[in-house]
Amino acid sequence: MDSRPIGVFDSGVGGLTVLKRLVEVLPGEDYIYFGDTKRVPYGDRSEEEIKKFAKQILNFMREQKVKAVVIACNTTCAVINKSEYDVVLFDVLKAGAESAALYTINKKIGVIATTRTVESKSYEKNIKIIDKNIEVYQKACPEFVPLIEKGLYNSPIAYETASKCLKELKEKDIDTLVLGCTHYPLMASVIEEIMGENVKIVDPAIKLAYDVKDYLLKKDLLNPQIRGKAEFFVSGDKDNFIKTAEMLLGEKIENVLHVDIEKY
């Protein structure tokens, strides 16, 4: 048994979709969530910047004495080398690739993600490790994250933007679509409506949450309490973060603390 918290981080509010799944699967755990709201979005930043940000955030997480860290940001997963860090890391991108390879029947998978994640070809590489015969079609949708951070994920402009971005993938006869950015599940209803009922929408956070549970069980690191708590930290704007967190998690978020992450 281990009562230390689990760390979860993302560039902003997107990782809250991962936290929600973790709480559903592991309700007894305590969580430390960090959203880098000052520097969001990560998708168009350089690899060097993202690596620097990840190092700062993981230093912060070490200070919080976490037992593991969930990288709830596909862009970060796509560029960092996990072996460089001495903390247990869980990778949302790998979980998404494994889920998609499992679900596809016609072996045609679409991936929507940030520009940096698409350019890295990380999803394609991870999927083809599982099955080299799967065709992977990737599409960058950089307009999604700014809309979601502003709370406009179910708005008419979100539908219009998603329709344009998904048009190319709709023509590829895919049967599976990976939401390759943790912000995107907030637009899942819009995306599902556009893609139609014959396309399976994959939220990587579902498998990821069970991967974390399996690890904690295997290592005897589960928190013995019945109901845990979550603490929230941000580097910038709190207002939209709190609004989205309360909507997703279904509870009042009283205490969101500001962190000067650049000092780490």
UniProtKB/Swiss-Prot annotation:
Enzyme class: isomerase
Record-annotated active site: 73 (proton donor/acceptor), 181 (proton donor/acceptor)
Binding positions for substrate per the UniProt entry: 10-11, 42-43, 74-75, 182-183
Pathway info: Cell wall biogenesis; peptidoglycan biosynthesis
Superkingdom of origin organism: Bacteria
Enzyme Commission (EC) number: 5.1.1.3
Gene3D superfamilies for this protein: 3.40.50.1860
Keywords: Cell shape, Cell wall biogenesis/degradation, Isomerase, Peptidoglycan synthesis
A GO BP annotation: cell wall organization
GO molecular function: glutamate racemase activity
Pfam family, one: Asp_Glu_race
Catalytic reaction list: L-glutamate = D-glutamate
Cystine residue pairs: none
NCBIfam families in the cross-refs: glut_race
Task of the protein: Provides the (R)-glutamate required for cell wall biosynthesis.
Family to which this protein belongs: Belongs to the aspartate/glutamate racemases family.
Protein name: Glutamate racemase
Organism: Thermoanaerobacter pseudethanolicus (strain ATCC 33223 / 39E)
Gene designation: murI
